[in-house]
Amino acid sequence: MALRLDGKALAATVERRLTSVVDAHSKTVGQPPGLAVLRVGDDPASAVYVANKEKACARVGIASYGAHLAADTPADQVLSTIQSLNADPRVDGILLQLPLPKGLDERPLLEAIDPEKDADGLHTLNLGRLLKGEPGPRSCTPAGVMALLRSNGIDPAGQRAVVIGRSILVGQPMALMLQAANATVTVAHSRTADLAAHTREADIVVVAAGRPGMVGAEHVRPGAAVVDVGIHRKPEGGLCGDVVAEEVEPIAAALSPVPGGVGPMTVTMLLVNTVVAWCRRHGIDHELDDLIG
């Protein structure tokens, strides 16, 4: 039976560490860390995600500054809102909730966020910092995956890793983080010929393709660690990932569940980025380097 890579339990542990840092320094600084989540439109899933992030902020002592704009808000008004948040001294982290309504281009809006307040780690400057191994906010989902691996004693150094998916949100930064941890990395995608031939050679498989049930028993070698980033709602109810868990669990040495694996750590890394930005701004020694390296 595969080791369960329990993101929910790890997220609770990390939240306790963040609470300790915030409690220790908020009075001296004069204000808590602040996270602003900008939501455009009325996507129901986005509303739930934002509410969950606000609850997580409250648990660790981060102040939430939500901004909600109508779906038909023009791009220049969204940009103006971002610029206001950039200038707001209460705000240490800014998140633009994706996806955006049709007609809004996310890239220039993400680029408008102050790189030092980029809580999602998606600004070009921060992706460049990741590439160069320099400190800066890290993309939340890949950083959460790395924390899950490390906390369960899975060291990527010298290991063969396959990342399925090449999005700027997960796949590309995931590959960079694994390379920085001295893994030998292959990036696969929907057009990769004979995907199983690649994944069966891997010690670590990270699946972020956005396709339910894409990876099954035939894709995994015995003893591999498999991280399932996908999350999908099944027609009959309930959730599933990109991995057929019941097939892979008897084969793999470790497997992240859906839900309860990567998802909780994605939210927690958003909090980590915000607290670290607050600490850097105020010259605080945060002792969170193991989560952002």
Swiss-Prot record:
Protein keywords: Amino-acid biosynthesis, Histidine biosynthesis, Hydrolase, Methionine biosynthesis, Multifunctional enzyme, NADP, One-carbon metabolism, Oxidoreductase, Purine biosynthesis
UniProt KW Hydrolase keyword: yes
Annotated GO CC locations: cytosol
GO MF annotation, one: methylenetetrahydrofolate dehydrogenase (NADP+) activity
Biological-process GO terms, alphabetical: L-histidine biosynthetic process; methionine biosynthetic process; purine nucleotide biosynthetic process; tetrahydrofolate interconversion
Annotated pathway: One-carbon metabolism; tetrahydrofolate interconversion
Quaternary organization: Homodimer.
The protein's role, per its UniProt record: Catalyzes the oxidation of 5,10-methylenetetrahydrofolate to 5,10-methenyltetrahydrofolate and then the hydrolysis of 5,10-methenyltetrahydrofolate to 10-formyltetrahydrofolate.
UniProt protein name: Bifunctional protein FolD
